[in-house]
Amino acid sequence: MTFKAVTDGVRCLARGAGLLLLALLCNCALQAQVLKPTGTFKVPTGVSAGNTTGTGNTNTSNPNSPNYNPFANDSTNADTSATKGLEYHTEIPDSILRQKVFLLRYNPTRVWIEQAWNPTLDPTGAQFNDALDALNGNYYLGKGFLGHPHTSLFPTLADGLTLRLQPDLYEGYYMRPDNIDFYQTLTPYTVLSYGSSLKKDYSVRVSHTQNIMPGWNAAFTYRLLNPEGVYTSSGATTHYLNATTNYFSTDSRLQAAAGIIWHSFRIDENDGLVNDSIFTYRLQTNRAGIPVNLVGASSRQRDLNLFGRATYSLERQSDKYRYRDSVVARTAGDSVTVLDTIEVVDTIPLRQPHMINAGVVGIELGRDRRKRTIADSTWWVEHTATLFWTNDAYPTHRWRNPLKVTAGIKPHSVTAVVDGDTMTLASLFDPFARVEVAILRSSLTLEADMRSNFNYEMKPDSRFAATLYYPFDSARLTWLSLSATAQNQAPDVRLIHDALAGQNMYLSNIATERYRLRFRHRDIVDLDLRANHMNHNTWYNLGGNIVEGTEGLWLMQGSLTLRLAVGPVHLDMQQLLQHSTDSVQMPTPLWATKNSLYVDLNLFRNTLRAQIGADLRYHTAYYAPSYDPYTGLFMHQNDILIGDYIWADVFLNLQVKRASIYLKAGHVNAIWETQPNYFILPHYPGQRFGLLWGITWAFFD
């Protein structure tokens, strides 16, 4: 089979799958029109609108339960107090769903409904993208925002097969189909947010979701992140927009989602300070006057991601009611026979759930285009498709399937242009499978994922994982998991290109084994221990050459997250410990910590909520990779230590109804630093002292 034939096959498959997805979405709209009741729907006496057959865990009201059904006990103003399924009941007014927004996740094997609470206070200030926090509030786990991007201080290995051009400056800010939100609500829901600072940093967010018809919602989110640079010729502007739609049929059998994600990133670049001593010893008090290596350089990137998915359950999810007219004869006065017409309800019950069932079929399509301009212009276009089947056909049912099986294929096609050279790879058959076996309360999950890259420069990838999960309670609030993973993956496409073009060097696949133990108790304790073994790790050195490790290395990692409270006093902390047996191949700090100590108060008869406290962050010194703006790459170095510095912030959060107000004095200890040494990368200082504020407001209208 020629490479052109493979590529053409992928395109034909994508077109055919696209037509199928379009047909399913059209069917969604037609089915919604047909199933929408025209009058009051009366549930027959003694008959439940949702199926309650089966055994096992009956906890459907706890959001953390795998059997959580947000509609399970919604009986306010209904004709009966019987448990309801995911059926749309017109006799229930919007007030039942007012104040409630149901958040969906884009998952290739299942769509689950969870409750999304109103925006609440966050002691890290992550909702306003503050100077030292990533989007999830842990600055050392991501890139940071208002400071210059840096590599992760806590690398995650063997999490899944990835196909990318190179490690990305903007990786911490990417919104993808699997991490954006899909909403289901009857009442329009809007979130507005604005943040700024004395240094002219600002961020804007506008989100809105609207119900089109029962089960069909549409939403959009726009964000603008525009931090001011910390010194000469630096700064950034990020625009982000997504528009999505999703549909649930009345019985949840047919589910579909589609959307578009657009990013535009720009970073004004200067390649760092010419002489760090000028900054450290305050030889130039005006930061704009400190000499830098470049003036006027910039990095720009534009991305466009189109995606869609649809799943259909071949098993009915609830009882079916059939109405018919029946003629009944009765004897009236004078023995006269009278014929009456009455309405009879036939109930076709849901068959007993069983692990052997028709299951759920699904399709997923995606097109991701990324164009980057630094010193050269690179671009990347990826077409993906996923076709799968699973016997997990009862996502809203409290019956637990003792044997869940998921299997499918992921054909893909990628075209990348690097330094004027075009690289293309494709595959028609990339199988994956997942088996989950219930063992009493616990479960054992086995996963396999393979990717064959039809390109002589890249070898096939594979990943195998086994996870043993044990919950200590029926609500699964306390649990323990043990897992082992073996992953074999080709290096990033740019590494492969540069190794061949510059060094005539063929790279080996990176082989990683990971052994992991994790314990979690509610939101109070989260302990995660990992032992990672890696062979053939690949990186750039300071000369821009590619180096492949000839010896294996071990990376031992441990993280402990604690959220403690005594009355109104709260202490949230995260401790990270790491040890790399080869710090040249895998440079990491030995210890990193983040601590938030604050008082959480409800004042004025609970009309005002306030949080007052401080953050402390620190990591030990290590040889952090340096950044090259010409290529957008990080390069390993062993000359300059970064870290061994405490960052301290003081903050105030206020919440009145659905409005949250945020005030923060960031990096307060910079005020009295006589010899500032707070670099986050070699030759790149971090943010100085600053005042930040913002407001977030949610509306149901």
Model regions and ranges:
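Bacterial Sec-dependent N-terminal signal peptides
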Residues: 1-40, 664, 689, 695-701
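Polar/charged alpha-helical tracts
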Residues: 8, 72-75, 95, 335, ...
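Intrinsically disordered, low-complexity, compositionally biased regions/tails
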Residues: 9-16, 20-22, 43, 50, ...
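Membrane-proximal, glycine/serine-rich, low-complexity loop/turn segments characteristic
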Residues: 32-304, 314-327, 473-477, 684-688, ...
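Exposed, low-structure sequence patches enriched in small/polar residues
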Residues: 185, 296-701
